[in-house]
Amino acid sequence: NLHHENTIREAFNRQLAAHKRKIFWDLNPDNPKAKIYTEYIDKYAKQYAEGNLLGGYNYEHFTLKDNVNISDERKLEIESQYDKKSIWYQRDILGKRVIAEGLIYRAFADAVNSETETCENRFKKKEKPPNLSEIIIGVDFGGNGSGHAFVATGITRNYQEIIVLASQWYDCSNGDIDPDKLGQYFIDFCYRVLNMYGNITHVYCDSAEQTLINGLRSTAKKQGLGWLRIDNALKEVITERIRLTNRMMAQMRFYYMAEMCDSLVTAMCSAIWNPDKLVEDERLDNGTSDIDTLDAFEYTIERYITKFIRYE
């Protein structure tokens, strides 16, 4: 709900001298133990019920179905844009306070796992997409215990679809990879994407490793790819990146190319919520799943969140 603690306190303080002090709070459901409940909403409800909260307290719970300004047809349209197995559907549509737990991309994992029996996977494409307007590469640098990851993503015209074109992950668990060797891995990946799909419009890298980024720029220049635009990733809030990906999957606007994205498929099928985080939503990052590849993929789409939503 993006209600920062300092913002809440400041908003309250600004009304201390008001003649008719009123605070209106409108929000979507969150984690049941989020501070917005434990420190404010539920706390005030308890105090009011006990007669200890002066000034009054009103609480109403509404869902999408209670909105009289939205037609039934539009409500069904909105509901169809969510994966019914996701926490976003439970919260935004059903209005429930739920903990983020289990698989993050359950619908995707189900489609991949059932493919051996049904020979169908609705997220997989086998033919080269004809209408790509942008091809973006994301790079995440790993250290000991993780790995370096490259992901190439194609975006179709008018931001209608996300199509992951290729992914590659290099293990660093036994020691980091030499920067020159990493640079060559990067160049090989770029040429593979160029030869198969066409021009690369941008490369976004993990901004925490400026030395490695400069190394990629230098290697690219030496090997005929000096025109590549290699910049820092935006590093949007992780839950917002996850939310977009789940939303695109639910609307069948997310795909990946067959035989080219093994590391990404594995990463998505094993991504889970952190079971130890009872207050906030957090993706588990303890080495049991490939977070490097997930980050690299998300770097390719995070700058366009509003555009993907705008063209729904």
Residue ranges and their predicted role:
Residues 147-154:
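Short beta-strand scaffold segments in enzyme catalytic cores
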Residues 1, 26-28, 139-141, 153, ...:
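Short His-Asn-centered micro-motif
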Residues 68-142:
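ATPase catalytic-site recognition across NTP-hydrolyzing enzymes
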Residues 116-120, 301-312:
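Acidic two-metal-ion nuclease catalytic site recognized across multiple nuclease folds
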Residues 161-284, 307-308:
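Mg2+-dependent endonuclease catalytic cores in nucleic-acid-processing enzymes, primarily RNase H-like
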Residues 3-82:
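ASCE P-loop NTPase helicase motor core
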